[in-house]
A protein has these predicted regions:
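Long, low-complexity, intrinsically disordered polar/charged segments
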Residues: 133-142, 186, 211-221, 256-274
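Shared catalytic-loop signature of beta/alpha-barrel
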Residues: 228-245, 250-347, 351
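Catalytic beta/alpha-barrel core
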Residues: 167-175, 193-200, 217-227, 243-252, ...
């Protein structure tokens, strides 16, 4: 379901970029490291009407992907923002084409596009969910649980999230912290919706270990192999009963189509930052829906900006599995928006206000800003 009614163009006058350091409520450990502070870039599109906000979901180091904060900061200020400002007036649907000559840097492109889109929709008085074609007013909320010190600690953490009302549990795994951790959670909580996420920690040589996870009746195993291992993922998928879901490998509509053609995955995790923007994310949703492939919305520890946009995206009809659109309090004691996402009966509401549907808390934003720069025409 392509965007039915494109947004109006806006006259861009500048961009303000900020690097934020947001303390996490607890350390978040994956197969590639531990975060205690979320470093992220937020973008403010300055226009002749309402300003718009976006989020560049890079981290401090190039561990999840090749993108990282300082590289994103440089390419945004030196190349991508100036290219958009040179156009003067443009519609959100034109942002991707303007930025296409610049290779890669999808997270930066996504953040800039979202800021322009937010500004345009605020000017029109339209909500982002309406623009996307959302069919739900709230979305089921899953939670991502990092690697804990031992299986017992993991069970304690999962139990706390289930008590809060999360409807699906995802646990991070890595070699040596996979089968026993998964067994502990399954034994403790029975037939809860459960999936695991490897963040590319394995190779095809680990197929026997990964096959041991089949006995736990998981919803899926997410990104077991490296980002560029589409062929090996297809080989592994034939070996496992557990559905293989791709995350890091899906960087565009074409990558999604290639993965489906090869049989590399039977489920797709869609992250707007990873694929270059929310419009590309909608296109991947449409591709998968037409192919009968389930999708769900992944998370990148977003602030209230990206979390609101993710909720709107996850309200599309093809998102049939609970995603990582959790409450803001899962990661942050204090968010940078005035009305952070909250968990209500296992769901997060889709904002209905203009644009993103959330307003920035200027004091909270200033308190976590470590660098700020503005570029104008």
């Amino acid at each position: 379901m392509p965007i039915a009614s494109p947004a109006a163009s806006v006259a861009l006058e500048g961009f303000e970029l900020r690097v934020l350091h947001l303390p996490l409520v607890s350390p978040f450990t994956t197969s590639f490291g531990t975060e205690t502070v979320r470093e992220v870039i937020v973008v403010r599109a300055l226009t002749d009407g309402p300003d718009g906000w976006g989020e560049i979901v890079t981290g401090a180091a190039p561990l999840y992907s090749s993108e990282y904060t300082q590289g994103a900061w440089d390419v945004a200020l030196r190349f991508l923002a100036p290219a958009l400002l040179d156009r003067g007036r443009l519609a959100p649907e034109e942002v991707a084409d303007v930025l296409r000559p610049f290779v890669g840097h999808r997270m930066v492109k996504a953040g800039l596009e979202l800021a322009v889109l937010d500004a345009a929709l605020r000017a029109e008085g339209r909500a982002l969910g309406e623009y996307f074609g959302a069919v739900h007013d709230r979305v089921p909320s899953g939670v991502s649980v990092g690697i804990q010190r031992d299986p017992a600690a993991l069970v304690d953490a999962v139990g706390g999230y289930l008590d809060e009302g999360y409807v699906r549990i995802k646990i991070k795994i890595k070699p040596g912290r996979d089968v026993a951790d998964t067994a502990a959670v399954r034994d403790a909580f029975g037939a809860i919706p459960l999936q695991v996420d490897a963040n590319s920690a394995y190779t095809l040589a680990d197929a026997d270990t990964l096959a041991e996870l089949d006995r736990f009746d998981l919803l899926l195993i997410e990104q077991p192999l490296q980002e560029d291992d589409l062929v090996d993922h297809a080989t592994l998928a034939r070996r496992l009963r557990t559905p293989v879901c791709l995350d890091e490998s899906i960087v565009s509509v074409k990558a999604a189509a290639d993965a489906l053609a090869l049989g590399s995955a039977s489920i797709i995790n869609i992250k707007a930052g990873r694929v270059g923007g929310y419009l590309e994310a909608v296109a991947i949703h449409d591709l998968c829906r037409d192919a009968g492939i389930p999708v769900w919305c992944g998370g990148m520890l977003e602030t209230g900006i990206g979390r609101a946009a993710n909720a709107a995206l996850a309200a599309l009809p093809g998102f049939t599995l609970p995603g990582d659109v959790s409450a803001s309090s899962r990661f942050y004691t204090r968010d940078i928006v005035t009305e952070p996402a909250v968990l209500e009966d296992g769901h997060v509401r889709v904002p209905t206000g203009h644009g993103l549907g959330v307003d920035i808390d200027p004091i909270a934003l200033d308190d976590v800003t470590v660098v700020r720069e503005t570029i104008t025409r």
